[in-house]
Amino acid sequence: MLLLSQSAQAQVQNMIVHRTDGTKVMFNVEQVDSVTFEEVPRWANRSVEARKLLAYLDEGAGKRMLSGVHACINYNTYEADWVYKHTGKYPAINCIDFIHDIYSSKGGWIDYTNQTIWKNWTNKRGIMAAMWHWGMPTNDGTTYTCTPGTADGETSFSPSAIFDPTSDGYKMMIQRIDQIATWMKPMAAARVPIIWRPLHEAQGNWSDQYPGTSWHKAWFWWGIDGPEAFVELWKVMYDRMVNYHGLTNLIWVYNAGDSMKWYPGDEYVDVVAFDFYNQSLSGTRQWYQFFKKNFPGKIYAISEFGNMPKISELWADGQYWSFMVPWWDNARTGDPNSEAFNSTDHNNANIDYWQDALKQDCIITRDELPNFR
C-alpha cells in the first residue's frame, strides 16, 4: 500500500486536477479553498471539504485506489469491522444505505438521526458514502419496494410524475428527498463530504444494443419510464438537495449503463461508476474503456461488486478505478457477535480477495487518508 507520513497525509502535495477541456491545474489539498470555479468549473456548488475529496480522487487517477465497503443492509460499520478483524486494516470508505428511510424513528430499530456511526467513522478520517434503495408503496399497500411491476408486492409508481409539479407523485418524491436531506444536514454542518450515489442501476436491462427483447426493462422504479424521466428526476433531486437544502458537501456518483441517453450531464455528475458481478477481466476492461471514451475528465469507480478480478489483476491490466466497494454479505456480517463473523468466507469479496488488495501499492485504507476537513 501507499505509505504516507503524517506530514504527507496533511499536505498531499502536487495535486493535479484534470479539466474537461484537457488542461490541468496543480495545487495541494490545503490550497483547494483558494482554487476558483473558473479554474475548475465543476467545483461550483461544492464545499471546501467536497473539493478536497474530489481533488484527491482526481489527482489519484492511475496512482491509487480507495478501498471501501457497503454497510450490511443499512446503517452500520459491520462490513468494515469484519475486514479489520481479519486484516488489521479498515477500508477507506463506508457506504450506508437509506433503504429503511420510511421506518426510521428516533431511538427505533433504525434511526438515521443517530449521528454516532458517521461521527465515529469520519473522526478517524474515514470517508462516508451513501446510497438509497428508494422504496415506494407496493400495489397492495402493505409495504414499500423499489421493484417495478403490477404484482401485489411490486410498485406501479411512475417517475414520470416528476414532469408535473402539481401531481401527488411529484409531491411524494420531493417529500422523500427532503427527508434524506434532513438526515444529511448534520454531516454538512460538521464539514463531512459524502460520496452520494442515488438512483443507482437505473438503466437496468434497457440497452441500445438489444432493444425490444423480453428482458429490456428497468430493475428499479426510477428507471421504468426510460431515460427522459430518469434524467429529469436526477436533476430535480440535485437542485433540491444542493440549491434548496444547501448540501454542497455531496459528491455525485452516476451509476452508468451502456447508453448515453441516461447520463444527466457533466454539471450534475462528479463520478461515473459501474457495478460488477461475476465479471471477467475482459468484461471490466470493456467498461473501463467505455468510460474513458464517453466520460473524459470524470472519476471512474466500482460502486458495487461481487466475484470480479482481483485488484492486482485490474491494476496490471491498466484499469485504474478510483475506488472499489464490494457488496455486503448478510449471512457473514449481519451479526458481529455470531460465529459466522469469524469466518473468512464472503459471497462477494472474501479475505483472500482483501489480502491481495492490501498487498497492492495502489490501495488506500482508512489510516492512510489525508484530512479532508
Question: In which residue ranges do the predicted regions lie?
Answer:
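Alpha-helical scaffolding within the catalytic cores
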Residues: 52, 75-83, 112-116, 182, ...
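Loop/turn elements at helix/coil->beta-strand transitions in domains of secreted/extracellular proteins
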Residues: 62-65, 89-92, 123-128, 189-195, ...
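Aromatic-lined carbohydrate-recognition surfaces of secreted/lumenal glycan-active proteins
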Residues: 68-70, 197-200, 234-260, 297-308
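Substrate-binding cleft of extracellular glycoside hydrolase catalytic domains
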Residues: 103-106, 112-236, 243, 247
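N-terminal module-boundary/linker segments of secreted carbohydrate-active enzymes
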Residues: 18-22, 38-111, 118, 313, ...
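Bacterial Sec-dependent N-terminal signal peptides
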Residues: 1-13
